[in-house]
Regions:
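Electropositive phosphate-/nucleotide-binding environments in soluble metabolic enzymes
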Residues: 31, 35, 57, 91, ...
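Conserved anion-binding
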Residues: 1-72, 80-83
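Glycine-rich beta-strand-to-loop/alpha-helix junction loops that act as flexible
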Residues: 75-76, 107-110
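Residue-level detector of anion-binding/catalytic polar loops
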Residues: 72, 103-104
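C-terminal helical cap(s) of enzyme catalytic domains, especially alpha/beta-barrels
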Residues: 96-101, 110-137
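Catalytic cores of alpha/beta
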Residues: 61-63, 82-103, 119-123
Length: 137
């Protein structure tokens, strides 16, 4: 709420995403942290959503059940080549992430690590859009 107060001083409107889960191997976030973060977020009108673990469909499903349908879930840790990265990253598939309850995928090396970044970005856009349409059926 301190950020929102600062925004009000400069007549800026914005929303906050809270970090509820992480996709990197060995991170220190546990289910109690996730629940406490969500409880904190429910008390603020400025929280528009949560960052979830894109590499774990089970954790996304749990997060969706905790936050409900009225909040967005953004998921980093997304790569069409699911598995592990060179620096401890864990990756999940965009389709699986969306099907499990994520609203937005965050892609890093799956795009910037490719020689044809435009084609890579289109592949992620198509995969996530198709998953959104399937989820809506």
């Amino acid at each position: 709420d301190g950020i929102a107060a600062g925004w009000a001083d400069v007549e800026r409107i914005g929303g906050i995403l809270l970090l509820a889960q992480m996709s990197s191997r060995g991170n220190l976030l546990n289910p109690d942290y996730t629940k406490n973060t969500i409880e904190t977020g429910k008390g603020s009108p400025h929280v528009i959503g949560y960052i979830g673990n894109g590499s774990s469909t089970e954790e996304i499903i749990q997060l969706r059940s905790l936050v409900g349908e009225g909040q967005m879930i953004w998921t980093p840790g997304i790569n069409l080549d699911s598995g592990a990265g060179k620096m401890g990253q864990r990756y999940g598939n965009p389709r699986d992430s969306i099907a499990s309850g994520a609203d937005i995928i965050i892609v890093g090396s799956g795009i910037h690590g490719q020689s044809d970044r435009i084609a890579a970005a289109k592949a992620y856009a198509n995969a996530s859009w198709d998953a959104i349409l399937e989820r809506g059926k």
